[in-house]
């Protein structure tokens, strides 16, 4: 009889330990979700997206994932994912979403579990990519906290980009090329903006004004996440 009681006590203690562990894991995940502020930033060429991303990195200590930079880095390092991506690029093909997500996941995981959040710049560009990003983060107990759209009127974007082209001598910053780039940007992002609105994550920022005022608007969003 005594042995039976002791066994039941032991089983109960074991059960309580496992339940406690599950609760702690769940709490850790919830805390991580609260602490991490993963931001998707949208902005047409010339919107000041790069400048505002730099300010967010400096102020909040966020990591930054720019798809263009990541691809160049992976290819330069000769990683398996980079070499696979290079094969598609060399053949004039688009990089499949699955491969792009694998590359982003690899970079995201390299930050460890103590980072404060990530700015996703240049990704997603399509709704399937947004869904894949959501799934990738969810598998890690994380999520996109906000999608921030820097909205600048097209005539102002044209002025900024033409001026930039004149100052830098960039041939791709002529008026005709700029118009094409802006058309492509709006075609790509409008469905995504609607998708993020449905997710309750879309935040609109007026991209006209001083850097300080625009960043103050961004801070008011991030500080209340």
Regions found by a protein language model. Name each.
Residues 3-225:
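Glycine-rich phosphate-binding loop of ATP-dependent small-molecule kinases
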């Amino acid at each position: 009889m005594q042995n039976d009681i002791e066994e039941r006590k032991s089983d109960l203690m074991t059960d309580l330990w496992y339940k406690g562990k599950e609760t702690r894991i769940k709490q850790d995940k919830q805390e991580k979700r609260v602490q991490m502020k993963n931001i998707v930033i949208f902005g047409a060429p010339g919107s000041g997206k790069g400048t505002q991303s730099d300010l967010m990195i400096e102020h909040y200590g966020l990591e930054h994932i720019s798809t263009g930079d990541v691809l160049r880095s992976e290819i330069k390092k000769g990683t398996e994912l980079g070499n696979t991506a290079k094969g598609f690029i060399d053949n004039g093909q688009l990089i499949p979403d699955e491969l792009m997500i694998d590359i982003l996941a690899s970079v995201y995981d390299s930050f460890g579990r103590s980072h404060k959040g990530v700015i996703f710049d240049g990704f997603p560009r399509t709704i399937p990519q947004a869904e894949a990003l959501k799934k990738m983060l969810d598998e890690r107990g994380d999520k996109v906290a906000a999608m921030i759209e820097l909205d600048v009127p097209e005539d102002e974007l044209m002025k900024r980009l033409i001026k930039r082209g004149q100052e830098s001598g960039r041939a791709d910053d002529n008026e005709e090329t700029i118009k094409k780039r802006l058309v492509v940007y709006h075609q790509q992002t409008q469905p995504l903006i609607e998708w993020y609105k449905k997710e309750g994550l879309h935040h609109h920022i007026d991209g006209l004004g001083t850097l300080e005022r625009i960043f103050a608007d961004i801070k008011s969003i991030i500080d209340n996440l």
